[in-house]
């Protein structure tokens, strides 16, 4: 296409060529923003968000302390300091309002899409192909889990730095001056990726694959291998740290739990599953049932995989992108494919975030003969992007809250215990004990040896008054996993409700030896106070405050112990602080009123009892004490 000016003819083709990638990216960004708009109203979910972020006291440290802890501490079977720092900053800025945390995830995903475009364009020089791949990556429903799940910040951050590492490496390869600075930048970005999540641990191998195509520099074998040595050393160090941490926290399945044959079968099935879900992204869920894989099915999958690899190898001269695409997809899945089993999930949507790029690369470059500027082709691409946006927007709604997420998971795969267990937790916290018991029971039907469900049932039965059953579940939880701190805590609570205080204190102490939590400190302090060990009880409550300075229950218990020790002013101060932190804390208001009544300050005591009853109309002690004060006041008036 050309247009004539007064003196010369000016081609408009370059403008058109630049306009198409920009239009594709703009469409994808707008579509992604629309599809994820609802997350601003979403909550934290019970899968990891509570433990990782919302209730993680370590993230509330000052920034220097947060950095120090992130670099040296392990939490939730992970070492990923940059992710912890990111979550800590979010908590400082947004508090426990999930909207801000979700919005940051969406922005990171959008940024990853833009970086992916820049990386692929730098690697291949193909702007339109790169834009199509980046657009499909942005709007694909398989990535909803990585974006709408706050705890998957680690996947987004790791991918951001991983893509930057590849981009810098591509610049290094093609640069004519100051090349080594770009290689150093690539190495630093890789280190940051591993410090966010060891998702990109296979990057050194991926760089060699990219050296084959599109960089076409495999002839310089010695140089290629030498420049990868620092990357390989970082990958080895990260792998060792990950294996140590995962094994120490019991997150890795033993060979006895999952046999090598089963691991290989699951890996072959998972490769097919990820490829299929990229093409047909339906029935996506937060957890999936492990599929039964027969020997015959395993043989078919292995043969299909072998044929595909053979075909890509045979086509390496004419269509080198096929081998690169296959190796990108299959190689980057290795850490999460189940050969080294972490957890019990056979596959997960979030694991496709990086490998899917390889599939998209193969498909889009396989369509390279298309005229991407043709109206029909552009309309088809727009239609595909639109359909994916609609499907993504629908999948995003699944993450609105715990019930939506968990019931959806059960609608996809009924025979998995974790959604039932977490629904039990949700209904217990919302006061629906009957439904909680139902889902805990269903969880044990699916997995009778689920220690976490036995732990939850121990405390629930004890609270409902069936202490014998609660103790039985607590003992079973500990038999199944003796180093589970919450199991010891739940058993201690069951013993406490049964009046077996000495055994309760022992269980709480064992829990604290495994993991020091403020709630368990308060539980043991409460038992010690009931046994008149006031000084040790006070020490437990004060230690709970060191762990969580905003723990209202700790202040309330300190006030109670101080009152029993005769220090009424200190008791009042503690109750005041408890009610300032939690204005609807009925027990603290009632205890404060009792101290004031003892001092003869009846009018203020009555006000405290009134506030206690406003917060909890069923608070019997506050009602009785207020009635007593009103009778005293009536008698005085007469």
Across the structure, where does each feature detected by a protein language model lie?
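Structural marker of alpha-solenoid helical repeat scaffolds
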Residues: 412, 446, 480, 513-514, ...
